[in-house]
Amino acid sequence: MDKFQRDGKEDTSRQWRFLYPLLFQEDLYTIAYDHYSNRSSSLEPMGNSSSNDRFSFLTVKRSISRIRQQNGSIVPFVNCDQNKLVGHNKSFYSELVLGGLTAIPGVPFSIRSKHPLEEXNEWTSFRSIHSIFPLMEDKIPHSNFILDIRIPHLTHPEILVRTFRRWIQDAPSLHSLRSVLHEHRNLIISSNLDQLILIASKENTRLSLFLWNYYAYECESLLVPLWKRFSHSRSLPYESFIERTPFYRKIEHIAIFYHKYLKKSLWFLKDPSIHYVKYRERSIIALRGTYLLVKKWRYHLTNFWQCHFHLWLQPYRIYIDELSNNGFSFLGYLLSAKMXPPVVKNKTVDDPFIPVLIXKGFDPAAPVXFLIGSLVKEKFCDISGHPFSRLAWTGLTDDDILDRFDRIWRNIFHYHSGSSKKDGLYHMKYILRLPCAKTLACKHKSAIRVVRERFGSELFTKSFPKERESIFLPFSKTRSQRERIWHSDIIQRNPSVNPWWKEHNLRIEPLFDR
């Protein structure tokens, strides 16, 4: 293991070529076997299913060796009853090779990690979600257009084989990978990532996620260098920033004696506002420029996917949002950049005055209509807000009923506490109070008025007052105008972070624990 780690440090290019050394070197089979047999490793035990009782890395290696000795031009397809590539039962060898492909790729990633994956807490595992909001709070107000990109999903196994071809230098390994992907097409073909996870079996879910993440990495690895080159290049203005060329030409004619320092001045004058955020199968590119520049970006992105991956990209997968007119939905929020006049007081010798300064500000809003629709879906109320009692909870104690409603409210409020306006959240709290009171009234066979008189202020606010004081303390007492507005204390991912617009063909997960 130490030798493999040292070799990885000597040549960093090997970290993305792990399939070749891990599947076709002697000592790494021992590493993978130790990693697989160790119960404390990050891999899940695979002994629950009957197919994995026959699994062994020695059998996998022998089957791969037999594959290498065959004619590589023969490719098995889904409709074949007999796998000619291995000469024996198709399902037996494909399951063995699939098991090896599932277990072995996790070895180099676990070596690169300082701590085992099972020791990582929830905050560490979801830290990337936390970093998205401060980035947007700082960068989005300086942008005026958003490219909302849905990463196109794979439609054919050969697309993945072509991407692996650049990293794997052994042709027989590509044929073995092709045979597995053709037989298990449901691992890569789906309408969205959630459906991909649901279709894949329990044993193959890790491989499905690995293939999807590798494909997403390929998309980003070829685009991010272009963005960095665009934002950090020191080339002439007419080569990089066509919109500002007339302005720079005027500078050349007016300030001729600054010609030697013109290039350095352009470094400070140019516009590098290009920001990229990705979550799951959705990417956001924030741009500052003209509408023509944004259309060019969409045109080039479309051509990139069509030419590089031989994949047709539907036009609706790259949507242009103008921040000045509309917002966009991301991670369960409605995000926009609105013009807000900050209060600035200036004092002079004669008399003080307040100038009017118009600046853009980041405006996150909670989607109240969507949250109310989620309450309707979970049968807490109807579409008009009329409450329903939870008859299934009437057999619980009063404290359990209060705790369940209180947990629902805290989950909603903690995640959406970064909203600039919280009137809609308090409206959600008022709607949830009524089903809570009605459930208790059905249990005690009394009226809602009697329940309110009995529980008083403890109704649905059993543990909320202390949290409300701690959450609003930065906003009401100690927060200055220069501080961030994002004080949300999220400790786990809320299902409401998934986008909800039906026109984007995305699925909404339930918000509440049943």
From Swiss-Prot:
It comes from Lepidozamia peroffskyana. The gene is matK. Pfam families: Intron_maturas2, MatK_N. The keyword RNA-binding applies. Belongs to the intron maturase 2 family. MatK subfamily. GO terms for cellular component: chloroplast. GO terms for molecular function: RNA binding. Usually encoded in the trnK tRNA gene intron. Probably assists in splicing its own and other chloroplast group II introns. GO terms for biological process: mRNA processing; RNA splicing; tRNA processing. It is found in: Plastid, Chloroplast. The keyword Plastid applies. It comes from the Eukaryota. Its main location: plastid. This is Maturase K. Keywords: Chloroplast, mRNA processing, Plastid, RNA-binding, tRNA processing.
